[in-house]
């Protein structure tokens, strides 16, 4: 699904049938266990919705999991291409050790936390999309 980010300017919306747990991760919100790499990356480019659940009985060959039908609606204020790669790298580095705070996970990024105005003692799932975008803009490789 992340590969569709490059097409976000060319579509009105996209629909997918995915495993229910994946849908919950895609649609995760700040401060929850589902606010992770996938939900943060997608939320920078799309509004996400779980439209409805699909039970195993809906399939000829019943899967052992529930499914959900999701909708992704592209955002107009998309992250520019020069920031996208840095943004993805910051997200990946932040979640390298989910139990550590972002200061420890982003140690190699050499960030000035006081200049950013972000609490460096937050865990990755406690950092907002806006703050991740701010970190990415200040990140120098």
Could you describe each region identified by the protein language model?
Residues 1-129, 134, 140:
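Class I S-adenosyl-L-methionine
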């Amino acid at each position: 699904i992340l590969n569709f980010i490059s097409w976000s300017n060319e579509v009105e919306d996209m629909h997918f049938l995915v495993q229910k747990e994946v849908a919950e991760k895609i649609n995760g919100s700040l401060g929850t266990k589902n606010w992770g790499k996938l939900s943060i990356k997608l939320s920078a480019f799309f509004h996400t919705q779980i439209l409805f659940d699909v039970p195993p009985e809906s399939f000829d060959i019943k899967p052992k999991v529930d499914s959900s039908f999701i909708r992704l609606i592209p955002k107009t204020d998309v992250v520019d291409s020069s920031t996208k790669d840095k943004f993805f790298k910051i997200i990946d580095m932040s979640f390298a050790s989910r139990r550590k705070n972002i200061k420890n996970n982003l140690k190699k990024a050499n960030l000035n936390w006081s200049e950013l105005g972000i609490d460096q003692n937050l865990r990755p799932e406690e950092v907002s999309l806006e703050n991740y975008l701010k970190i990415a803009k200040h990140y120098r490789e």
